[in-house]
Amino acid sequence: SLVVAAAAASPYSGSHDFSGFQRDEPDGVPTAQKQHDINFLLHKLYEPLHEANLKALEDSFDPLTHTANMPDAGVAVNKLMQEVKTQHLEERHHWFSVFNATQREEALLLVKVLLQCQDWPTAIGNAVYFRKMMNEETYVYALYTAIKHSPLTKHVVLPPLYEIMPHFFTSSEVIQQAYRAKMIGQPGKFNMNFTGTQNNPEHKIAYFGEDIGLSTHYINWHIEYPFWWNETFGYQIERRGENYFWVHHQLVNRFEAERISNHLQKIEKLHWERNLHEGFDPHTSYKNGEHFPFRHDDIHIEDVDKVAEVRDMIVMENRIRDAIAHGYVIDKEGNKVDINNEHGIDILGEIIESCVYNPYNEYYGSLHNMGHMMLGHQGDPHAKYYDTPSVLEHYETTLRDPAFYKLHKYIDDLFRKHKDHLKPYSRKELLFPGIAINNIHIDGPLETYFEDYEYSLMNAMDDKEEMKWEDNMEISAIIPRLRHKDFSFKVNIMNNNDENKLATIRIFAWPHRDVNGVIMPFNEGRWHAIELDKFWKYLAPGENEVTRKCDESSVTVPDVPSLKSLHEQAEAAIAGISELNLEEFVSATGLPNRLLIPKGNAAGVEFKLVVAVTDGEADSVNDEINLTTKFHHYGHHGVYLDKKSHGYPLDRRVPDERLFHEIPNFGETIVKVFNHNEHVHRHE
């Protein structure tokens, strides 16, 4: 119950005394209250609300009478209400895909409404009202996006999607076991296996693509950087296209490193006119019972009805290749826009994903989004047997399919062609005068292992409307997840200047050898580098021993607390028992911190560990940059904090690696990552 609202008919019907709460939001409503409300909106998503005050608000709130303070004077609300009135919205208990233009536009209507809200009573009123009116999955996408971008909810933590919509992350077999346990009233914990069998070589790395934390990272990144976003939603997102390049480049490189750890050949990039060798059966179902489509091995890529023809994809690709070769793209007015510069990667990324800022959408098309839909429908390109979207058409599930990595290896190759057209960095550009790296080493073991992880299937089960949260039966899934033991980077840096210097410390690694044991040349290795950390540090004159713990990495984030934990913490804060302190979980766009390093193997996989120390004053866009990047590696609310390109200084070709070896502010060493088949069972 809402303690602060005990004296009111509705928690938002009048003024309240929030004494004892931290007024950390623009409208003075405490974060604990907002976290409580969001928790209950998402609890039992597919059922009516289970919280009395919110249910009362649902019955009394009229969106049309709460538009006075909206900047658009209620235009967005009126438009969405018209869709409700004419019953044009997607029906409930149906699938939703952001790649479906009609469904996406419905979601954006709600996003616009929620972002127009200037106070919490209006925001939660609209969120409650439209919860019962809209398709559940459309609603979740819109709600998560609005919470991520609204200044009203800057301290609210989004619950993990694998607990809100468990069907997307949990095998049908485990869901069926959970249903049976629910029917007989028996709590249960059910072990879930990865997709496929030992007969499929790709099964060896299913732990990576099917990692629920990695999938959470991916969808959270797309929520933070939606391809449809423009400034009418509140602000412009900087370097959107470049961020698109980098997050996918890193996923491809990390997938390649995992393949080497498991003695698998490198990814073959997609070719539209060749066969797609890897099939995929996701073994998952939608909440309504429909199965995700599967795909056989060795299929010839066909035209897909109502999506695109293969030749359309080739035309799009060739136009992008021509732009890269010429060094410019064409905008809608026919003007040439130069891309042979540090900002070109941003324009190219906008074009490939077909973002709103794409200079000429009609000409360059939508290679990325259309590619997902084309490959997703290859199991049934003419819709003879089903019309449900595949795993490739949901951010929650797309990383599971090997075709995702083939598509993005193909796209990554286009980005590399562009980057290789740029002039290599000169010694003058790379040098940080007076700064030298004396030594790099790792303190602690570079060793990975698997550990069981348990997450709730509560939202997958149906309950009576009067069921209280505390009365829910404990039913959960258990899945092994890759982790690593604690370690620290230690870098000895000499500052030969007479004053403190702000330094950007950039740490990367790439496989020293390919799967055949051949040493990667520097120029090839640097393109396959995975980013391990980037942070800012003041270097005092003389010798500096810089220590950075693995869990401090700006590339990664910790696991978001479970929905149950968020509920308990919010209720305790509202009751005055404890303070709500969830700051470290607010930004969830980073990789899971347990996946910082690749798996390795029993013999040890060699990696070249490289550290570049660059001029922090020249790099930063913010005087407080060293204090603000801990949890916002990809930037925050549209602002990216590092002026340098993603991957700098390894993002451009290196004709002669001796240049890097001779620069004192660049250092390298060889390390080994081990995995001894250790599996920690926590839930026996």
Swiss-Prot record:
UniProt source species: Homarus americanus (American lobster)
Family as reported in the entry's similarity comment: Belongs to the tyrosinase family. Hemocyanin subfamily.
Protein name: Pseudohemocyanin-1
InterPro entries reported in the protein's UniProt record: Di-copper_centre_dom_sf, Hemocyanin/hexamerin, Hemocyanin/hexamerin_mid_dom, Hemocyanin_C, Hemocyanin_C_sf, Hemocyanin_N, Hemocyanin_N_sf, Ig_E-set
Tissue: Strongly expressed in ovaries. Also expressed in heart. Not detected in hepatopancreas, gills, connective tissue or muscle.
Top-level taxonomy: Eukaryota, Metazoa, Ecdysozoa, Arthropoda, Crustacea
UniProt signal peptide: 1-23
Subunit structure: Hexamer.
Further facts: Does not bind copper.
Main function: Does not function as a hemocyanin.
Pfam families assigned: Hemocyanin_C (PF03723), Hemocyanin_M (PF00372), Hemocyanin_N (PF03722)
SUPFAM superfamilies membership: Di-copper centre-containing domain (SSF48056), E set domains (SSF81296), Hemocyanin, N-terminal domain (SSF48050)
Region of interest (Disordered), ranges: 7-32
Tree of life domain: Eukaryota
Gene3D superfamilies named in the record: Di-copper center containing domain from catechol oxidase (1.10.1280.10), Hemocyanin, C-terminal domain (2.60.40.1520), Hemocyanin, N-terminal domain (1.20.1370.10)
Glycan-modified residues: 100, 193, 230, 626
Bilayer-spanning residue ranges: none
Keywords carried by this UniProt record: Glycoprotein, Signal
Gene Ontology terms for molecular function: oxidoreductase activity
